[in-house]
Structure formats: structure tokens, C-alpha cells
């Protein structure tokens, strides 16, 4: 590479530099700066005031010097409570509620991701194999819930699953049950609404990957004697791995920090870290 080409690569036009700078500015403003603020608070001491933590630095006007007060007590409490949580002979009453709820959040998010994958994969596969008109209609049906408020959709489930909701009233009128079922404020309702809310985020990445699958590969596998199941595990599934990873990340990451659904339909026994931090 000659000097001129190297110079052109290092000193691009201002427009190109501006375009490249946009994602870095986005990360700086929305991730690095908030992370730095939280990191600063973690080294402060708690107090009943506004803001509810002590400043890390203060100026002594009499002596004219800068005082730095860094506390490691928050980190000591984390490790101590973490040990109490894991130790079967430890003080379970002092176990850190944040660690327990974070573990509960991971389990709930993992369950949601697995169920979304099991439902979303065949759905995305069926959409990708439909004709163009049917495909557009099915994609519209997947996107249709996003046209309404997320909060309204959660409230709709409250009307369906509640003690006096539509499902219980229907079953009582049909004399299928004698008393209303406990469909609300439990793990069942939490997982059900979580799957409903995040299922489109699994289907769409899978669809974009499966729709690009070359049918000639499946035809060649069939000509060589491979059955549908073997063709799926040797061709379709490996080629859709990127969509599986993308969909799983889009579901798992926001599901861990979800607080609206646990607050409205999860009840007091199904705590998640987003709900605890919000409260």
C-alpha cells in the first residue's frame, strides 16, 4: 500500500467520519456515560438525602485541598450476601434479595427464550415457505400487536386471565369448573405473557434467515437419500444458526430486565430484578 492510499484511509472525508462517529456517540451517550455514573455511585456511601449517596470528592476550603472519600462497603456487602445465598449453612434471612431476584430473572428469561424458540422456529419456517401473498399477510399478523401500546396488551391479558376474567367466566358458564381457576399472579401467567410479548422478536430474525435458504440444497439432500428430518438437522438448522442466536439475544436480554409484566401479572411471589429495582 503506497503512502497516498494510506493517507486516504486515515483521513477520510468529513461526511464519512460523521457517519462512522454516529454509533460511537450513541454508545457514549446511552451506555458509557450512564455506566460511569452508576460506577461512581457504587463507590459512595448511602445516606438519606437527595441524592441518596455521598459525594466522592469534596473541597476543604480552610486547608485548600481536595478530599476523596471512596467506600468499598457496597462491594463487600455484595460478596457477603452472595456467600450467604450460596452457603447452605449460612444465614438465609440475610441473603441478598437482589441476587435471588436476579437468579429468578435469569431463569424466567431463559424459560421465555426457550419457549419462544420452540414456538417461533416452526412459525418462521412456515412463513418462509408460504407463497408471497400469504407470507405478507402472516408477517402483518406478527407485526400487528406492535400497533397498540405494550401496556394495553398486558392489560388485555389481565382481562383474560383474571379471577373474574373472560376465560374463568366462560368455563363457569359452561359448567366445566365449579370455582375460578388461579390463572393470574403466578408463574404460569408470568411466562405466558412474557412469551406473548417477546415472541415476535424471535420470529422475525428467524424468518429473515430461513427465507434466504436455498431450496436446491434440500433438493440435493433428498436426491442423495436424506429424509426430511436428516435434511433439517444437517442443512436447515445449521444455516439458520445466526437467526437463532440473534432471536435468542433479542428475547433473553430485555426479558431479564422486564418489570412491567412481573408487576402487573407476576404477583408478589415472582420477583424479577427489574421490578425490585423499580420499587
Task: Name the predicted role of every residue range.
Residues 152-154, 159, 202-205, 243-278:
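Non-cytoplasmic
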Residues 22-23, 144, 196, 201-215, ...:
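Transmembrane alpha-helices
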Residues 3-9, 56, 154-195, 229, ...:
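Membrane-interfacial helix termini and adjacent extracytoplasmic/periplasmic loops
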Residues 18-20, 123-160, 218-219, 232-233, ...:
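Cytoplasmic-entry segments and transmembrane alpha-helices of multi-pass inner-membrane transporters
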Residues 11-16, 49, 59-62, 72-82, ...:
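Interhelical loop and adjacent transmembrane-helix boundary motif
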Residues 35, 109, 113-121, 125, ...:
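Hydrophobic positions within alpha-helical transmembrane segments of bacterial inner-membrane proteins
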Residues 1-41, 126, 136-142:
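N-terminal signal-anchor/first transmembrane alpha helix
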Residues 87-127, 228:
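Transmembrane alpha-helix signature in integral membrane proteins
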Amino acid at each position: 500500500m503506497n503512502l497516498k492510499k494510506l493517507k486516504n484511509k486515515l483521513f477520510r472525508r468529513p461526511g464519512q467520519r460523521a457517519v462512522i462517529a454516529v454509533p460511537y456517540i450513541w454508545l457514549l451517550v446511552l451506555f458509557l456515560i450512564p455506566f460511569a455514573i452508576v460506577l461512581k455511585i457504587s463507590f459512595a456511601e448511602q445516606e438519606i438525602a437527595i441524592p441518596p449517596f455521598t459525594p466522592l470528592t469534596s473541597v476543604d476550603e480552610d486547608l485548600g485541598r481536595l478530599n476523596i472519600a471512596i467506600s468499598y462497603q457496597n462491594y463487600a456487602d455484595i460478596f457477603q450476601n452472595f456467600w450467604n445465598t450460596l452457603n447452605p449453612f449460612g444465614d438465609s434471612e440475610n441473603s441478598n434479595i437482589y441476587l435471588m431476584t436476579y437468579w429468578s430473572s435469569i431463569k424466567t428469561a431463559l424459560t421465555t427464550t426457550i419457549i419462544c424458540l420452540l414456538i417461533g422456529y416452526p412459525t418462521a419456517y412456515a412463513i418462509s415457505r408460504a407463497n408471497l401473498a400469504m407470507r405478507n399477510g402472516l408477517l402483518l399478523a406478527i407485526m400487528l400487536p406492535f400497533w397498540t401500546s405494550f401496556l394495553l396488551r398486558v392489560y388485555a391479558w389481565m382481562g383474560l386471565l383474571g379471577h373474574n376474567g373472560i376465560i374463568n367466566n366462560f368455563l363457569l358458564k359452561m359448567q366445566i369448573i365449579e370455582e375460578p381457576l388461579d390463572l393470574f399472579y403466578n408463574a404460569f401467567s408470568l411466562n405466558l405473557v412474557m412469551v406473548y410479548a417477546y415472541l415476535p422478536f424471535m420470529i422475525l430474525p428467524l424468518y429473515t434467515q430461513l427465507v434466504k435458504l436455498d431450496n436446491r440444497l434440500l433438493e440435493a439432500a433428498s436426491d442423495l437419500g436424506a429424509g426430511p428430518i436428516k435434511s433439517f438437522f444437517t442443512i436447515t438448522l445449521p444455516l439458520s444458526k445466526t437467526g437463532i442466536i440473534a432471536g435468542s439475544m433479542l428475547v433473553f436480554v430485555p426479558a431479564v430486565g422486564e418489570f412491567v409484566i412481573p408487576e402487573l401479572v407476576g404477583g408478589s411471589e415472582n420477583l424479577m430484578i427489574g421490578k425490585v429495582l423499580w420499587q
